[in-house]
Amino acid sequence: MAKALLTPRAVDFPRWYQDVIAKAELAENGPARGSMVIRPTGYALWERIQRELDDRIKAAGAANAYFPLLIPESYMRREAEHVEGFSPELAVVTIGGGKLLEEPLVIRPTSETVVGESMARWIESYRDLPLLLNQWSNVVRWELRPRLFLRTTEFLWQEGHTAHVSETDAHDYARRILHDVYEDVLVNVLGMPVVVGRKTVRERFAGATSTYTLEAMMGDGKALQMGTSHELGQNFARAFGIDYLSASGRRELVWTTSWGITTRLIGGIIMAHGDDLGLRVPPRLAPVQAAVLVVREGSGVAEVAHTLTAALRGAGVRVELDERVGVPFGRRAIDAELKGYPVRIEIGPRDIAESRVVLVRRVTGERIAVPIDSVVNLVTAALEADQTALFTEALARQRQRTADVTSVAEAIEASSTGWARLPWSDVGSDGEAELNTHGITVRCLVRADGGVPDSEDEPGLVALVGRAY
């Protein structure tokens, strides 16, 4: 019955993706083209992602702040490469209060410019550095081919902005965010194996000197960029006059970074972990880790349901108690399955009579009757096991669908089903341009040992190539 709710992934992966979003009540299209309404189930996922990221960002020393949504157009023009890169995506306000504005205002596509203007006022001496800021906000980038969570005109994100006394300090901090914050959350919370690498000059962020990325493989073999961290050199410092009095008494420009992750991660969770029954949420991320479902009323059923719910919460499990016996049980069970709750506990009169409950694991599909007094231990063990299982499954797919090749032609062929790896020296700028004509990009460059390079000119680099969302 549940399978009929969704288009099978093997039949039409994009349609399956849209079906999951709709049936699991994650989001829907907004009234303006490219806009998105994030429904409570979807927003709960974003809140969990926010919490995991925010804790780590603060542990890295950054403080949250908020900067204006409306940015004077002249700010964007101060950094030539930046405005050139974003110009096709800008939404601009020209009328306010019924009158033509003296200067058009850009609706925030990213905040390097407006943050840079504030940094120039806040930083006076080396004692004010490093300045480490983070913002949770929405941004607008005009999207011609919108797709829920993956590409929408307006989306939610966090964007970090930092200023440092030296290039080395900025480099180290950009890499710290990349690994200690982003990679940690993606791998250990979202159960998402990622390739961490360096973007080519063609693919790097507009105005950056270096862009680092985390790339994940989706269920159809395509790549999804999960997050980026940028070294901005002194480009924005020069454009906005962000300087400081050094310990030696000289005025010097700061070195800046920026980094961000968006609601795109929710799309990644769907496509990396979902199956033909719907969403499968990694237990460490899941807003609801266990759903306690009362099958129907009966002597002792409600009491056991409440007792188990309290015991699970006492063990640190995030629980939802569903006592809506007026709603058909099958519908409620399918709903829990679609939304990817890791564990479902079913309790009915027959179960109480036999001093047991039924435990259903979303990842494995296992359905077993278990003694009531063993539920808490079994649930906590299942959550850890299934977190590992989702990561292992995704990693196996990534390895199976990544081909080592020796030419651009072979990379193009391999990209029809997954990723290709080949020496960067065999690609170069000409090969990258050839790949682009086929809708394929160099996702990132890595060292032969999997490390992240400091320059794309390092010898022996490997290019990861594929189609992407």
Model-derived features: positions:
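NTP/phosphate- and nucleic-acid-binding module
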Residues: 1-469
